[in-house]
Amino acid sequence: MPYRKYREKKYETKYREAFKVFQEKIGITFTDEKLLIQAFTHSSYVNEHRKKPHEDNERLEFLGDAVLELTVSQYLFQKYPTMSEGELTKLRAAIVCEPSLVRFANELSFGSLVLLGKGEEMTGGRERPALLADVFEAFIGALYLDQGLETVWGFLKEIVYPKINEGAFSHVMDYKSQLQELIQRDGSGNIEYQILQEKGPAHNREFVSRVTLNNVALGLGSGKSKKEAEQQAAAEALKKLKEQL
């Protein structure tokens, strides 16, 4: 056997073993291992191995992007029943953005599994954020095709959803959403907002709102609209609760 073929065979054996260990780590065994390998195959690797029937991960990335948006949207819709469409959209965007996907990929050492061309390898492609985010999406696409939506949901329940529950994305929420997220995480009870007062002429109205948790006042706020007053009340409540933590 020529040395080059021997080296390539040894390389592929090493990666197959790595993929086996990876599947054991995540507790999922692919029915079609080719899909798993394709998810981690960068176009630069395909370009350097044209004689072999390799496919890059770009189509899987396209599919995974859509599956990720759907599953995260469903999770947020169920978890935050009173959150507005705008806030849900903003929160979802923070979860599926490149830095977040890179964080998820790094947590599972995706970079070490990527099949790269020599040029991409030499320029640090294994650690390039855009590449890692693409691989994470491609993996979700491959997992969906191989196992279905339920398995994707189970995987995200282990890797992504706990970070939402831990407040990793609270910074993109408005005050009311942050307060709701904090209370839900703590399991403390129900939040209610009450407008205590309306004053001033019709063209310059001022509202005073109070937010309560299990009938205990947490904060007061005022504003030119009911929404603004509630936001300010939530901001005061958040400040108090965080001081107690």
UniProtKB/Swiss-Prot annotation:
Catalysed transformations (reactions): Endonucleolytic cleavage to 5'-phosphomonoester
Keyword rRNA processing on entry: yes
* EC number of the protein: 3.1.26.3
UniProt KW keywords:
Cytoplasm, Endonuclease, Hydrolase, Magnesium, Metal-binding, mRNA processing, Nuclease, RNA-binding, rRNA processing, rRNA-binding, tRNA processing
* Residue stretches making up the RNase III domain: 19-148
**What cellular component terms from Gene Ontology apply here?**
cytoplasm
- Please list the GO terms describing molecular function: double-stranded RNA binding; metal ion binding; ribonuclease III activity; rRNA binding
Q: Which InterPro entries match?
A: dsRBD_dom (IPR014720), RNase_III (IPR011907), RNase_III_dom (IPR000999), RNase_III_sf (IPR036389)
Function field: Digests double-stranded RNA. Involved in the processing of primary rRNA transcript to yield the immediate precursors to the large and small rRNAs (23S and 16S). Processes some mRNAs, and tRNAs when they are encoded in the rRNA operon. Processes pre-crRNA and tracrRNA of type II CRISPR loci if present in the organism.
Q: What family does the Swiss-Prot or TrEMBL record give for this protein?
A: Belongs to the ribonuclease III family.
Q: How does it assemble?
A: Homodimer.
Spell out the protein name for this chain.
Ribonuclease 3
